[in-house]
Amino acid sequence: MNGNEMEIELNEPLVSVEEYLAAGVHIGTQQKSSDMKNFIYRVRGDGLYILDIRETDERIKLAAKFLSQYDPAKILVVTSRQYGQYPARRFADSIGATPIIGRYIPGTLTNPLLPRYAEPDVVVVTDPVSDLQVIREAIQVSIPVVALCDTNNMTSLVDVVVPTNNKGRKALSMIYFLLTKEFLRHKGYNTSLTPEDFETEM
């Protein structure tokens, strides 16, 4: 998809429309959930749903501001999705959060007897489907959840939705980079990091 297929303007965007499109942030799936309909820009001829990057841009700002209210050490970043693992860890390391990358051990938030038992104040996940276990546990212990949500995701268990392609390598790198940059800005820091610093090697 090129720029003229999404002729929109962003209000004080974090990056340009072209950069969002180049990263594939807008590319959804061929399924649309009722929860995500307000974040969808259009459906392509091949049946692929396209996310509205105006919503993505605003929700990244919202999520970063929300997360910046917390002590970074009390933010838990969880992802089992392959292309989410490197950027999620880089995000966690950059802001001082705690990452759980790969397999999530059930009971981490609910069973104090586990060696890796955690008591975060907020949880960030890459995909509400593959990271469902931690979301369920967060609800049990009343911890808010920030989630990267694609067109097919249900969001009823999520407190802050960031609409994005949550499967693509470049898209996840861009989203976690922008969350990092905005989070640090709210904390009073600048960063020299770039989206490429968050990109998983092929």
From Swiss-Prot:
The keyword Ribonucleoprotein applies. Pfam families: Ribosomal_S2. GO terms for cellular component: small ribosomal subunit. HAMAP family: Ribosomal_uS2_A (MF_00291_A). Gene3D superfamilies: Glucose-6-phosphate isomerase like protein, domain 1. Belongs to the universal ribosomal protein uS2 family. Keywords: Ribonucleoprotein, Ribosomal protein. The keyword Ribonucleoprotein applies. The gene is rps2. One of its GO terms (molecular function) is structural constituent of ribosome. One of its GO terms (biological process) is translation. This is Small ribosomal subunit protein uS2. NCBIfam families: uS2_euk_arch.
